């Protein structure tokens, strides 16, 4: 059994090494310009950030550089992921390689941009001014950067949902009917995921969950275009979902 898995493990190791190497090279480049990146990151907050420990400046530079390196490396990471998956697919299924890499990278960047320009400015302003009549907000640079990177990367990953739906529908694993049948269960999972990948505050979780619900709806439309379910199968999925609900109650 191990001998059968060995080629796959070797291939996985190869793809991971390329991905990690790409991130490392990008990290070294980003670290050289970390101050410029920090100014870009801090642009959404008009207050003053403070340093609480001697090594905090170094930690901030490392966090910012590493997060920027991940964003820059996403096309290579998606390419390596595809090269690992592709050998197990049929020839017609391999035709999704360009959409997978292009839209995967694009949706990640779109999610990060949505977080940076729309979500993060509102959240940081709200949280920083909440209770401002009672106490002054002295936010450390390290906590600010951690909050920022977690939100940005979280939204980047979350926006991959339509890409995943396209890929799974293309290979025939899901249909629009199967996604619609389990919509209410998906809502619960979405809020759980939002609680995991966002900072631990309700505002961030709601701002993450609402776009995810919209992306789930978009995924249904994508699945309908790529792999629509026959009418009979759609009714079967709805009946299965209803029976599952009854059994739980």
Swiss-Prot record:
Annotated Gene Ontology cellular component terms: TAT protein transport complex
Gene Ontology molecular-function annotations: proton motive force dependent protein transmembrane transporter activity
Membrane topology recorded in Swiss-Prot or TrEMBL: Multi-pass membrane protein
Cellular compartments annotated: Cell inner membrane
Entry-linked PROSITE patterns: TATC (PS01218)
GO biological process, one term: intracellular protein transmembrane transport
Domain of life: Bacteria
InterPro entries: Sec-indep_translocase_CS, TatC
Membrane-crossing segments per the record: 18-38, 69-89, 96-116, 151-171, 187-207, 208-228
Primary subcellular site in the record, as a coarse category: membrane
Keyword Transport in annotation: yes
Keywords (A to Z) from UniProt: Cell inner membrane, Cell membrane, Membrane, Protein transport, Translocation, Transmembrane, Transmembrane helix, Transport
Cited function: Part of the twin-arginine translocation (Tat) system that transports large folded proteins containing a characteristic twin-arginine motif in their signal peptide across membranes. Together with TatB, TatC is part of a receptor directly interacting with Tat signal peptides.
Family according to the record: Belongs to the TatC family.
NCBIfam families named in the record: tatC (TIGR00945)
Quaternary structure (record): The Tat system comprises two distinct complexes: a TatABC complex, containing multiple copies of TatA, TatB and TatC subunits, and a separate TatA complex, containing only TatA subunits. Substrates initially bind to the TatABC complex, which probably triggers association of the separate TatA complex to form the active translocon.
Designated name of the protein: Sec-independent protein translocase protein TatC
Encoding gene, per UniProt annotation: tatC
